[in-house]
Amino acid sequence: VVNGTGVYHQHGPVADTGVTGRKLAVDFGTGRIGGGCPWTKDATKADLSLNLYARRLAKVASEGAHEPVEVSIACCIGKPDIILTTKFLKSGEITASNGLKMSPRMVKEMFGLDKPGYADMCWYGPFGEYQQDKPWEKSLSDM
C-alpha cells in the first residue's frame, strides 16, 4: 500500500506522535519490523494493535504446524481490509490471504485493550514470558 489514505495535510511528529523506536527492535525480538513504533500510542493505532494481532495469529499457526511462523500484515489506515502473509520458517511454505477484515478497533475489543496494563508492556516489551497473561500470548489450549 503506497499512500493509501491520499493527500497528507500533516505529517511527521505533528500528525503521528510516536517515539524514535530504538526500543522497538528489542521488544519485537526476531520479527521483522516496518518502522512503526507502538510506544506512546494507544490501541487505536495500527502500529500497536495489528502487531499484537499478528503475534496471536503466529502463535496459533505455529502451534498447529509445530514450527516457527512469521506473520506479516499489510493495511491501509482507515480501511478494515488487510493482506495477511504467513511464512512457515522450517518448511519455507508461504500462504497469503486477501480481503480479510481487521482493524485496530476490532483488535482493541478482541484483546480488551481499553483496560490498564500498558506500563508492563513498555517496561518488559509486549511479548514473551512477562506477558503470559495477555490474550495474544495464550495458546489455543489456554483459551
Where are these regions (language model features)?
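Glycine-rich, mobile lid/loop segments that gate access to catalytic sites or pores
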Residues: V1-H11, M110, G128-Q132
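Internal helix-turn-beta structural module
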Residues: P68-M143
